[in-house]
Design a protein with these regions (language model features):
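Extended alpha-helical scaffold regions
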Residues: 1-558
Length: 558
C-alpha cells in the first residue's frame, strides 16, 4: 500500500503537496522512530523530498519546525539503514538547495535564503538533537550504546559535505549552553563535538576507524575552502585538523615513529585507515605535504614495510595499504636521494610480484592525470607541484627503475601472457598502457636521468626503445591466447582470455593513436612501417583466430 502511494505521489511537486494540505499530512507521526514505522517513514520522506526542487520550496519546508526536528531524529536514531540513508540525503539536499550566496571560506552555493540552515543550526530543539543522539554521556529513551555509535557514524558521514557547503555553520558555535554541556570549547560548534568529543576513540577501536575516515573525508571535501591567509597549500579543513592535533595523531598511527609505542591491537585495526588518511593528504595537498618533514618520514616507513622477500611478494598478503600510499604520493617525493636504492619504488619487484605492486608501478610511471577544466579554479596549494614537475618526476623514476631492473619488460610481458593468472596479467598490461599513455613533459627538465639506457621524452617512444622494444612490441602484435577450442566451451578460461585480449588490444590501440600523431608531426623517422604493422593487427580485432592452439573440430550431421 505504501509503495503504491509513493508511486502515486511520484509526479507531484511540493506545491501540489502543499495544496493537498501539509496540515492534514501527519509528517511528525509518520516520521516517528520504530520498527513498525519504516513504511510510513519512507512515505513521509518521499513527500518531503519534493521540497528539494527549489529554494522557495525548501524555505517553506524549513517553516515546519516539528517536521524538521523529526527528520533529524529519524536520521540519527532509526534502526533501518535504508530509512537513515534517505533521511540523511533529504537533509543534505534541503541544505544544499537553500544555501545562501557564497561567503568567505565557503564553497560556491546556491541562491537560497538560508532558512533551512537557520532552522537546523539556529533552532535549539533541532540543534540539540545532534548532541543528545550522538553523545555517549546523554541518555535518550530507546537508544543503546550501539544505537549511539550508529548515530555517530551517520553524523560523521554527512558532516564533511555540510562543511564544504557552509564551513562557518558547521565550525562555529550557535547555542553556548548546549555546547558547554558537552564540553565544547568557547566558539566551537558541531564540528568540535564530532571531531574532538563525541567518539571514545581510546576505548572503541571500531569507532576510531570511523573517526579517521571522517578526518579523511573532511580534508578532501574542504580542499577548495581557502583559508584566505598567507599560509600556502592550505585549506580550512586541513588547518582545523592540524590546529587541533588530529593530523599529527592520525599520521603517527601509520608512521610508528620511534618512541610512539602504539598498541599492537589498535595498530592492526587502524593502520589501513591511517595510511588512507595520509594518501588523501598527499594527493589532495601535495604542496603542503612536500613542504614539511612528512616525505622523509613516509619514505622511511615505506622502505621498512616494502622490504619483503620474493616469496612473500608473490604468495603472501600484499601490503595494499602501503602500496596505495606510495601510489598517492607526489612523484617528487619518490625520487631517489643519491643512490636508486633510497627510493621506495626500488623495492617494488617485477618478477616475483603481485597485481597490487604492478598497479602501483603503473600509476607512478604514468604521471599525473590530464587535468580537465574546473570552475572555480582550485586554490594555488592544491595544484602544486604542477603537472609538468610531476610528469618529469614520473619519467625520471621510470628510467631509473628500468636502468636498475633491465629485466622489467621481459617480466611484464611474461606476466601479461599468463592467462591462468588473470589479475596479474591485467595488471602487467596496465603497466604497458600506462607507459604508452604517460603524461610526461616534452620540455627539458633538470632531473638527472640514467646514462646507460635511451631516455626518450614520450612514453610511446619509450616503449619502442631498448630494452622495452625487444619484448613489448612483439607481445602486443602477437595474436592473443584463447581456449575456445578446448573442452568446456566458454567457461572461466574463455572469460579470462577475452578480458586479457581486450586489455592488450586497447594498449595496442593507444600505441597506434600516438604513433599516428608522431608520424604526422615528424615523418620519415621509420615509424611508418611499425604503424602499418600495428594497423594490420588492429584490423583483426581483439580475438584473432591465429591465436588458437590446435584445430576446432567440425561435426557433420549425417
Amino acid at each position: 500500500m505504501v509503495n503504491l502511494l509513493i508511486k502515486l505521489f511520484d509526479g507531484w511537486t511540493w506545491q501540489q503537496v502543499c495544496e493537498f494540505g501539509t496540515q492534514s499530512i501527519p509528517f511528525k507521526d509518520g516520521l516517528a522512530v520504530g520498527e513498525g514505522m519504516v513504511p510510513f517513514n519512507r512515505l513521509m520522506l518521499a513527500l518531503l523530498e519534493k521540497a528539494t526542487g527549489s529554494p522557495a520550496d525548501a524555505a517553506h519546508a524549513a517553516s515546519m519546525l516539528e517536521t524538521v526536528q523529526a527528520v533529524v531524529k529519524l536520521w540519527l536514531c532509526t534502526g533501518d539503514t535504508g530509512v537513515a540513508t534517505q533521511a540523511g540525503q533529504l537533509i543534505q539536499d534541503l541544505l544544499k538547495v537553500d544555501s545562501p550566496a557564497q561567503g568567505a571560506g565557503d564553497a560556491p552555493t546556491g541562491g537560497g535564503q538560508g532558512l533551512v540552515w537557520r532552522r537546523v543550526f539556529g533552532d535549539r530543539d533541532v540543534y540539540s538533537m545532534f548532541f543528545e543522539s550522538c553523545s555517549l554521556s546523554s541518555k535518550v529513551e530507546g537508544m543503546s550504546k550501539n544505537a549511539k555509535t550508529l548515530a555517530q557514524a551517520r553524523l560523521m558521514e554527512v558532516l564533511p559535505r555540510l562543511a564544504a557547503m557552509n564551513w562557518q555553520a558547521v565550525a562555529n558555535g550557535h547555542h553556548r549552553d548546549i555546547e558547554a554541556k558537552y564540553e565544547i570549547a568557547q566558539g566551537g560548534g558541531l564540528l568540535d563535538f564530532a571531531a574532538l568529543e563525541m567518539v571514545d576513540y581510546k576505548e572503541d577501536v571500531l569507532m576510531h576507524r570511523c573517526l579517521i575516515d571522517f578526518f579523511s573525508d573532511m580534508m578532501q571535501a574542504t580542499a577548495s575552502l581557502d583559508t584566505h591567509t598567507m599560509a600556502p597549500h592550505d585549506s580550512l579543513g586541513l588547518q582545523y585538523l592540524i590546529t587541533h592535533g588530529l593530523h599529527a595523531r592520525t599520521s603517527a598511527i601509520y608512521l610508528q615513529l620511534p618512541g610512539s609505542n602504539p598498541d599492537p591491537i589498535d595498530s592492526m585495526f587502524l593502520y589501513g585507515p591511517a595510511a588512507n588518511y595520509l594518501a588523501t593528504y598527499a594527493s589532495t595537498y601535495p604542496g603542503h605535504f612536500l613542504a614539511g618533514q612528512m616525505p622523509k618520514q613516509v619514505n622511511d616507513r615505506l622502505m621498512h614495510t616494502l622490504e619483503l622477500s620474493p616469496g612473500r611478494w608473490a604468495h603472501s598478503d600484499s601490503p595494499k595499504n602501503d602500496l596505495h600510499l606510495a601510489a598517492s604520493l607526489p612523484r617528487k617525493a619518490l625520487l631517489p636521494e643519491g643512490s636508486w636504492s633510497s627510493s621506495p619504488v626500488s623495492l617494488l619487484p617485477s618478477k616475483a610480484t603481485n597485481p597490487d605492486a604492478l598497479h602501483t608501478l603503473a600509476t607512478i610511471f604514468h604521471g599525473p592525470e590530464r587535468k580537465t577544466l574546473v570552475f572555480p579554479p582550485p586554490a594555488e596549494g592544491h595544484t602544486d607541484p604542477d603537472s609538468t614537475e610531476e610528469g618529469a618526476a614520473a619519467r625520471a623514476i621510470y628510467y631509473h627503475y628500468l636502468a636498475n631492473n633491465p629485466r622489467f619488460w621481459q617480466d611484464i610481458t611474461t606476466h601479461a601472457d599468463t592467462v591462468a593468472l588473470k589479475d596479474l596479467a591485467l595488471s602487467a598490461i596496465r603497466c604497458i598502457t600506462s607507459v604508452i599513455t604517460a603524461e610526461w613533459p616534452t620540455t627539458t627538465t633538470d632531473l638527472p636521468l640514467p646514462t646507460t639506457i635511451a631516455t626518450p621524452e614520450t612514453g610511446h617512444l619509450a616503449i619502442l626503445s631498448p630494452p622495452a622494444l625487444e619484448y613489448t612490441l612483439p607481445y602486443l602484435l602477437k595474436p592473443p591466447q584463447t581456449f575456445a577450442n578446448l573442452v568446456g566451451g566458454r567457461g572461466d578460461p574463455e572469460s579470462a582470455a577475452y578480458l586479457i585480449a581486450s586489455a592488450k588490444f586497447d594498449a595496442l590501440r593507444a600505441l597506434n593513436s600516438r604513433l599516428m600523431v608522431q608520424v604526422e608531426q615528424q615523418p620519415g623517422q621509420g615509424y611508418e612501417e611499425i604503424l602499418a604493422t600495428i594497423g594490420k593487427r588492429l584490423a583483426e580485432g581483439p580475438m584473432s583466430r591465429e591465436g588458437q592452439v590446435g584445430g576446432n573440430v567440425g561435426v557433420l550431421e549425417l
